[in-house]
Amino acid sequence: MSRIANKPIVIPNGVEVKVENNVFKVKGPKGELSQEFLPYIKIEVNENEIYVKPNLEFMKRKSDLKKMKMFTGTYWRLFNNMIIGVTQGFRKELEIIGIGYRAQLQGKKLVMNLGYAHPVEMEIPSDVAVEVPSPNRIVVSGIDKQRVGQVAADIRRWREPNVYSGKGIRYVGEVVRLKEGKKA
């Protein structure tokens, strides 16, 4: 079994957890999340702890147990991220590097000048908040870790860092290894 799934997930105060029909639901101070899970997994909810275990009722062969154990660690991490999301939330920061490269919010759209002939406009999803504290910095935040990461990756994809000059959109703290240019 996944070693991480041996530990229980601690439910903090102010968080409600429900398991109904293979759907794990979490409600907390920042919002509500739900995640469907496979029937191979059995979830035991005690007073303030959650245990993720393989469901042995579905085991027909010995090889099935390996598949069930494989999913326990994945779902343990997904459920733990949901609990962290509804209590603390997640955020990703991006920085824009390059002369004339900048971003701004216009209503529900993120408008970026990234060296193309036209400004790039991107709709902001309703479940994610995007802030632009300065023209060369973008902050993506929300309660769903997967969603926050995907929106940040979509923004970064518009102009990934150039390996020769380093210009583009990168995560704060990301190290871009620069290649050496041609020698004359």
UniProtKB/Swiss-Prot annotation:
GO terms for MF: rRNA binding; structural constituent of ribosome
One Pfam family linked to the record: Ribosomal_L6
Entry keyword annotation includes Nucleotide-binding: no
GO cellular component, one term: cytosolic large ribosomal subunit
Keyword field: Ribonucleoprotein, Ribosomal protein, RNA-binding, rRNA-binding
GO terms of biological process kind: cytoplasmic translation
InterPro entries assigned: Ribosomal_uL6-like, Ribosomal_uL6-like_a/b-dom_sf, Ribosomal_uL6_a/b-dom, Ribosomal_uL6_bac-type
Similarity annotation: Belongs to the universal ribosomal protein uL6 family.
Quaternary structure and interacting proteins, as annotated: Part of the 50S ribosomal subunit.
Role, per record: This protein binds to the 23S rRNA, and is important in its secondary structure. It is located near the subunit interface in the base of the L7/L12 stalk, and near the tRNA binding site of the peptidyltransferase center.
Protein name in the entry: Large ribosomal subunit protein uL6
Organism per entry: Thermosipho melanesiensis (strain DSM 12029 / CIP 104789 / BI429)
